[in-house]
Amino acid sequence: MKKFGKVVVKLRIPILVLSFLLLIPSVLGYFNTRVNYDILYYLPSDIDTMQGQDILLDDFGKGAYAMVVVDGMNKSNVSKLVKKVEGVDHVASVISYSGIVGDDVPSEILPDKFRSYFENEDSGATLFAIFFDDTTSSDDTMKAIQEVRDVTDNQCYIAGMSAVVTDTKTMAEKETPFYVLVAVVLVCIVLAIFMDSFLVPVFFMLSIGMAIVYNLGSNYFLGEVSYITKALAAVLQLGVTLDYSIFLWHSYKEAKEETPDDHQEAMAVAIGNTLTSVVGSSITTVAGFIALCFMSFTLGLDLGVVMAKGVVLGVIGCVTILPSFILTFDKALEKTMHREIMPNFDKPARWIVNHSWIFLIIFVLLLGPAIYGYNNTKVYYDLSDTLPEKLNCSQANKMLADNFDGTNSIYMILADSNLSAEDSNAMMNEVNDLDGISFALSIDSALGGEIPTEMLPDSLVSELKGDEYQIMMVST
């Protein structure tokens, strides 16, 4: 290991030059790596949800959908709004009140139940559905969501997963650099105070930052990464690999005490000692991240590969780039040395060792409450609830819930296209009786037998009924 250290010491300037040059392709790779904002994409392909999405695309030419709430607009203007939305690229179809019965049919002659699906007479809100020709998080769908907002001059509220994904993308792109910067500043402040040099944290951040950029840039070869991975990777890599840099610095100081007149020899020894200690530690860390790769929910694979790669690059940077920085700016580091503020923990350490049985008893006693807490902690699965209320999608979900019978989310059921009207109504009635369901409807149940299906436009029927399947909607 010491031989490797001597090579690094000898080639420190070329290493620094190369490390800066590698930032160029890494930055290009980072900006050209596609980010996936659809959590559903990472579900196994054989589950019903993903099979249903494939059927929607193959049989109906639809992937994503959104519910649009229009507040305080008369029917004529809503119809004009729908026409605008239909003209947006990648909007496959729009299902609205006017599209079903036309503008000339008085709403008073229609069943109250049917009208309630599209109108709230008390608040003046109107509801219609948009279907897109691509999947929930595709670039085309997100672009279409934004264009719908633009053509309607923000007069409508777009709810649904595609709107959530679009707003999540905007928010993540805006906030990720900010909290990474906050993490770096906080780490620098803590290290500058508790270490013996004000300058060394800067070189820690430079070497770790380069490794992070290499990691994020090399994601280009993975094709795409999830927005969760992109948001977490930098901060996680910083936290996981920072200890390696601290270990190298302390090892270098100890080696300098033995060879005070030869700092290059001291660094070679420090690199060797760091490699010996850090490799074992990093392997266990890498193994932990690789374990995520075996999840059937493949977000684990996405995060595991990126973080395992980040740890390896962090170790390499710690024993190549960081030593090169330290030796190159050794005199500047010496000038910024100060007395360590961190107190000596020798006495507490000896006391803990001498009274270890006390801590054993304490932790055994804490095990029971810990297990109870783990088993009784409530887990939420709705990511949209974690988003700020000021986002467009959050406001839209609230409008949807306030105006249409507590509706929060709308889902689709794909049923047999040849299902009779009687069986369809019976199925929807059973679904409506389930806890947490606001409403469930199919074409037959929406009409309620009072309006013949034949009265509906063929274009509408074909949107909801195919050769093998028909679309039913369920709201929770």
Predicted ranges, named:
Residues M1-V35, Y41, T136-Y381:
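Membrane-embedded transmembrane helical bundles of large multi-pass transporters/channels
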